Amino acid sequence: MPSLNRVQLIGNLGRDPEARFTANGKKYATFTLAVNRSWKSVTGEKQEHTDWFMVNAWGKLGDFVVEYVKKGRLVLIEGRLQTDRWDDAKGETHYRTTVIARSIQLLDRKPEEPEEVEVAVEEVSE
């Protein structure tokens, strides 16, 4: 049976990307992405909510993000979801879902940058 794990998000970086390394020494970038949504309640009042996503970018894409993408930038991220499971010292099970970015496109523009920059790389696993 076919399967699909793909996500597209447009939002603003909640903090500057941070370079990290796995236990095996593989480098990646991690950051949060704020995606705003709004709707009208049954009474007609505007409601707003921000969903926060953890995003990891590996390899050259991660290097690009750390160097050029900063807090507040509007980006389009395409990638997949990855859920990690672990047990803590008390034996309690925890889960964390992260977006693994395959491409990141800058949607806002600074005067010294081109109108649109897109970087895509092959996916690298831990």
List the predicted regions and their residue ranges.
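Hydrophobic alpha-helical segments of small multi-pass membrane proteins
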Residues: 53-57, 81, 95-103
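A beta-strand/beta-hairpin structural motif
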Residues: 42-67
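Short aromatic-glycine-enriched beta-strand elements
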Residues: 19-34, 95
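Acidic, gly/ser/pro-rich intrinsically disordered tails
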Residues: 1-4, 17-24, 40-46, 90-92, ...
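Conserved positions in beta-strands of structured domains
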Residues: 14, 18-20, 58, 82-84, ...
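OB-fold and OB-like beta-barrel modules that bind single-stranded nucleic acids
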Residues: 8-13, 33, 71-82, 101-104
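Beta-rich strand-turn-strand
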Residues: 58-94
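Exposed loop/turn and edge beta-strand positions of beta-sandwich/beta-sheet ligand-binding modules
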Residues: 7, 27, 49-51, 95, ...
